[in-house]
Amino acid sequence: MNILQIDSSVLGGHSVSRNLTASVVADLVAANPGAKVTVRDLDQDAPAHLSGHLLPVLGGPKDGLNAAQEAELQRTETWLAEFLAADVLVVGVPQYNFSIPSQLKSWIDRIAQAGRTFKYTENGPVGLAGGKRVIVVSSRGGVRQDANELDLHEKTVDVVFRFLGITDITYVRAHGLAMGPDAREAGLSSARTEIAALNDGGRLAA
């Protein structure tokens, strides 16, 4: 089993999502001895945001790239290879101003490539990255207005992964983290319970 852990929080060791992604991955490894883990820290190694300078890197002929673009091409190919090789992705997705961290969006811009992870057909786009499992660790200071609906940052990653052909998506939520000590502990406790349920149900085993 190849496990890709994606961390995008800017809070380092104080990050709830980072601590929880590490916990999920530890349980995955315990349930799947010999699993290979790749950790991609999008804060410490942040992808550059999409720009005109990057367009030649992400599509079209690769001849004529300058040195900076060649370096970005190699980084992009590394991230794309990690994504394609992963059987399970554990993705830390904190909510920043109603959306996902910009560095996570930049990573998505690198791996969502026509002809590589999806394709266009006469009947619409088709994902090419199916067969993977995604565990999204969702964290936020507040709480969802509707417990039956995905939150805004969750909807973003859900749409992206489904567009790429991935339908096995599970959410671990630590919400209410900025609403006082009791709400914070309740959010953390809920997330721990959800992680334990993944393990109890045998969902962490290959």
UniProtKB/Swiss-Prot annotation:
One of its GO terms (molecular function) is oxidoreductase activity, acting on NAD(P)H, quinone or similar compound as acceptor. Gene3D superfamilies: 3.40.50.360. The keyword Oxidoreductase applies. InterPro entries: Flavodoxin_fold, Flavoprotein-like_sf, FMN-dep_NADH:Q_OxRdtase_AzoR1, NADH:quinone_OxRdtase_FMN_depd. Its EC number is 1.6.5.-, 1.7.1.17. Keywords: Flavoprotein, FMN, NAD, Oxidoreductase. It catalyses: 2 a quinone + NADH + H(+) = 2 a 1,4-benzosemiquinone + NAD(+); N,N-dimethyl-1,4-phenylenediamine + anthranilate + 2 NAD(+) = 2-(4-dimethylaminophenyl)diazenylbenzoate + 2 NADH + 2 H(+). HAMAP family: Azoreductase_type1. Homodimer. This is FMN-dependent NADH:quinone oxidoreductase 1. It comes from Cupriavidus pinatubonensis (strain JMP 134 / LMG 1197). The lineage of its organism: Bacteria, Pseudomonadati, Pseudomonadota, Betaproteobacteria, Burkholderiales.
